[in-house]
Regions:
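Extracellular cell-wall/glycan-interacting regions and their flexible linkers
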Residues: 1-93
């Protein structure tokens, strides 16, 4: 929850409860780790990436994720996960 709260305070996401609940409930594998690492790395909101693939690439380059294949294979399995990856990816650039 703290990671999602920080990301919302920075303006990166605007639905921290949605993502915190999804992470805590285990609805998306590794989501909690993604949010925590992103919150440790991101200092401010920036323009989103155009695609989830670009977001994943930026997150890999920033050291936030090390499992790009998982995220590329699963970004369309949970509502708005693709948009989250775009937001986080843009913010780490």
């Amino acid at each position: 929850q703290a990671a999602a709260d920080k990301l919302e305070a920075l303006g990166v996401i605007n639905s921290q409860d949605y993502w915190a609940d999804a992470a805590e409930a285990g609805k998306v594998q590794y989501l909690e780790i993604l949010l925590k690492k992103a919150a440790q790395t991101i200092t401010k909101a920036k323009p989103r990436t155009g695609t989830p693939q670009e977001g994943v690439a930026a997150l890999v380059a920033a050291g936030v994720i090390n499992t790009p294949d998982y995220w590329l294979a699963n970004y369309d399995t949970f509502p708005s996960l693709d948009l989250l990856l775009c937001a986080l990816g843009g913010a780490v650039k």
